[in-house]
């Protein structure tokens, strides 16, 4: 099972995610994004095979407390998984852009097309997922593989070398078909050597 530090970007979905992860047997500690990056880095150093998970949240990545600093300092040091705002922060940290989505969806199920690799191996394609966002990543740099889309909108990215990935959608939502399985496969991908 994974040892997860979940960065809480002050979102109502955070504890849905915590509950789903703990129900699968994972150890989860939660820190709010307002605390200093040093405190979180220190805690991660005392965890066995840590995974940093970046929660959904309001606003833009640059407004999300210590999250941008953590990404700059820890990318490539340990696996990082971002969801919604966390995904957008990953896109920005790699040099991509985040801006207004042409289509704003809050609490809607949407079918995404994916590449069937890594965390998406063996999953239905298209895959119904829950979307709650008005921002979207674009101009994705070459270090990130776009592994899922809804039309032209980027719905997931991954960096196989550094074990960093992000989902624009919410795998922890009841509207995401097989969300628990997707999270399990994502953690297995993140921890693969």
From Swiss-Prot:
Catalytic activity reported: chorismate + L-glutamine = anthranilate + pyruvate + L-glutamate + H(+)
BP-aspect Gene Ontology terms: L-tryptophan biosynthetic process; phenazine biosynthetic process
Pathway(s) per entry: Amino-acid biosynthesis; L-tryptophan biosynthesis; L-tryptophan from chorismate: step 1/5
Residue ranges constituting the Glutamine amidotransferase type-1 domain according to the UniProt record: 3-193
Example GO molecular function: anthranilate phosphoribosyltransferase activity
Subunit text: Heterotetramer consisting of two non-identical subunits: a beta subunit (TrpG) and a large alpha subunit (TrpE).
Function: Part of a heterotetrameric complex that catalyzes the two-step biosynthesis of anthranilate, an intermediate in the biosynthesis of L-tryptophan. In the first step, the glutamine-binding beta subunit (TrpG) of anthranilate synthase (AS) provides the glutamine amidotransferase activity which generates ammonia as a substrate that, along with chorismate, is used in the second step, catalyzed by the large alpha subunit of AS (TrpE) to produce anthranilate. In the absence of TrpG, TrpE can synthesize anthranilate directly from chorismate and high concentrations of ammonia.
Record's protein name: Anthranilate synthase component 2
Source species: Serratia marcescens
Classification lineage: Bacteria, Pseudomonadati, Pseudomonadota, Gammaproteobacteria, Enterobacterales
């Amino acid at each position: 099972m994974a040892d997860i530090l979940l960065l809480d970007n002050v979102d109502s979905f955070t504890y849905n995610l915590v509950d789903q992860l703990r129900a699968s047997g994972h150890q989860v500690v939660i820190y709010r994004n307002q605390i200093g990056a040093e405190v979180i880095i220190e805690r991660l150093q005392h965890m066995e095979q840590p995974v940093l998970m970046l929660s959904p949240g309001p606003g833009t990545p640059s407004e999300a407390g210590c999250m941008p600093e953590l990404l700059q300092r820890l990318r490539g040091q340990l696996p990082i998984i971002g969801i919604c705002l966390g995904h957008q922060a990953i896109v920005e940290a790699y040099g991509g852009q985040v801006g207004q989505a042409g289509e704003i969806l809050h609490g809607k199920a949407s079918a995404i097309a994916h590449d069937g690799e890594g965390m998406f191996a063996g999953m239905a394609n298209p895959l119904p997922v829950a979307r709650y966002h008005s921002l979207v990543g674009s101009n994705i740099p070459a270090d990130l593989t776009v592994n899922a889309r809804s039309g032209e909108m980027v719905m997931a990215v991954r960096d196989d070398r550094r074990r960093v990935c992000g989902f624009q959608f919410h795998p922890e939502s009841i509207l995401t078909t097989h969300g628990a399985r997707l999270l399990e496969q994502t953690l297995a991908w993140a921890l693969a050597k």
